[in-house]
């Protein structure tokens, strides 16, 4: 098939999904001799815009995995604002060294329902949003090499097609999609961190406003960054993006869950690709 434009489309709180999607899309665009376009829908304003694709396009679309699934706050955008129009797609998910569970198959199914035809898919490891040690430094050089190889193989598959496939690419995951992963304490009791919000050390804060500008939910008050006026999805864009390290979480359940993840899933996880 002749593809004229390859899109890199992504939500990325801390930058790992952006790095991965842009790398794969750039590799595919080069291999397919196609134009490269980029759309970042991380901010609330960006999620107001509809994106329409066509039969001569291909979208590498990526999101992070939250609790083993596509983040539920992204579902309205993914299901209503994207229109595939027969374009090919490569769904990509980033997971923080635990597991991508049903995140990839859920994203594949969403894109199929949006009018795309997924022809390849990948689940890649990125440093966990909660942690600086879990999946530390990933994607690293080896991961980038795997992304490049995946991009080449996916492009070769597309080039060999005479028409769009009748069925989307088979990927790992269960149908029906399983519930969101629930963290538990040492006694097996569920830990609910849905309403947990970050704190701000105002003695450290320099008032730059980056946290408010980068919050994907627009929940941090730019006039007083210590105030989180909307929902927090624990993407940690504010924590990891603060140059003064003034943002932090101190909720006991959150910290227990973070510590447990770092202990149980310390062994580096592998990327998985599907063609």
Where are the model-predicted features located?
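Iron-sulfur cluster-binding cysteine motifs and their immediate structural context
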Residues: 200-201, 206-233, 237-255
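Acidic, Ser/Thr-rich low-complexity intrinsically disordered segments
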Residues: 176-217
């Amino acid at each position: 098939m002749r593809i004229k434009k390859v899109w890199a489309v992504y939500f990325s709180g801390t930058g790992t999904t952006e790095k991965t999607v842009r790398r794969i899309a750039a590799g595919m665009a080069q291999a397919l001799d196609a134009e490269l376009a980029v759309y970042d829908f991380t901010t609330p304003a960006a999620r107001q815009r509809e994106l329409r694709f066509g039969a001569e396009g291909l979208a590498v679309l990526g999101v992070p995995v939250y609790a083993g699934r596509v983040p539920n706050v992204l579902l309205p955008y993914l299901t209503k604002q994207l229109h595939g129009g027969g374009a090919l797609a490569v769904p990509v998910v980033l997971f923080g060294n635990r597991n991508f569970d049903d995140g990839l198959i859920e994203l594949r199914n969403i894109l199929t329902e949006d009018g795309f035809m997924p022809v390849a898919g990948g689940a890649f490891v990125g440093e966990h949003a909660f942690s600086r040690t879990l999946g530390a430094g990933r994607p690293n050089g080896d991961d980038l090499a795997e992304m490049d190889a995946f991009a080449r193989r996916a492009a070769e598959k597309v080039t060999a097609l005479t028409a769009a496939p009748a069925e989307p690419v088979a990927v790992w995951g269960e149908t029906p999609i399983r519930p969101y992963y629930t963290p538990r304490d040492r006694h097996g009791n569920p830990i609910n961190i849905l309403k947990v919000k970050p704190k701000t050390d105002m003695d450290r804060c320099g008032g730059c406003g980056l946290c408010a500008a980068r919050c994907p939910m627009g929940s941090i008050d730019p006039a007083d960054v210590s105030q989180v006026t909307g929902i927090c999805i624990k993407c940690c864009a504010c924590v990891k993006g603060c140059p003064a390290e003034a943002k932090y979480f101190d909720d006991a359940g959150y910290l227990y869950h973070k510590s447990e993840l770092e202990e149980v899933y310390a062994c580096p996880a592998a990327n998985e690709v599907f063609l």
